[in-house]
């Protein structure tokens, strides 16, 4: 199939802007936080900003804890359902052979 150039869209312009601003192979989100911290510097953060960041970390950690608990619960349910399915299949096979 021959290569057909496509029309440029608004997203292409944004992508070109990002590619000029960032090194090759790196995405904007990979270095954005590090760049901000390098520009601001830790010593310039006041108590309010530190408190806001601490609360955000607590919220994120809490959400992660909830997701980990849900994952553990799901794994237990999945194992129980798989065991039930295998048991029903074995019982069905046994009944089929003995009839």
From Swiss-Prot:
Involved in the regulation of endoplasmic reticulum (ER)-mitochondria coupling. Negatively regulates the ER-mitochondria distance and Ca(2+) transfer from ER to mitochondria possibly implicating it in the regulation of apoptosis. May collaborate with RNF183 to restrain BIK protein levels thus regulating apoptotic signaling. The chain crosses the membrane at residues 79-98. This is Fetal and adult testis-expressed transcript protein homolog. It is found in: Mitochondrion; Mitochondrion outer membrane; Endoplasmic reticulum membrane. One of its GO terms (biological process) is apoptotic process. It comes from Mus musculus. It is a single-pass membrane protein. Keywords: Apoptosis, Endoplasmic reticulum, Membrane, Mitochondrion, Mitochondrion outer membrane, Transmembrane, Transmembrane helix.
């Amino acid at each position: 199939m021959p290569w057909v150039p496509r029309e440029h869209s608004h997203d292409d312009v944004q992508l070109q802007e990002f590619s000029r601003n960032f090194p090759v192979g790196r995405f904007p989100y990979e270095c954005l936080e590090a760049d901000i911290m390098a520009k601001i510097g830790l010593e310039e953060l006041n108590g309010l900003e530190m408190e806001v960041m601490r609360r955000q970390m607590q919220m994120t950690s809490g959400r992660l804890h909830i997701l980990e608990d849900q994952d553990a619960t799901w794994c237990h349910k999945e194992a129980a359902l798989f065991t039930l399915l295998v048991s029903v299949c074995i019982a069905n096979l046994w009944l089929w052979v003995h009839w």
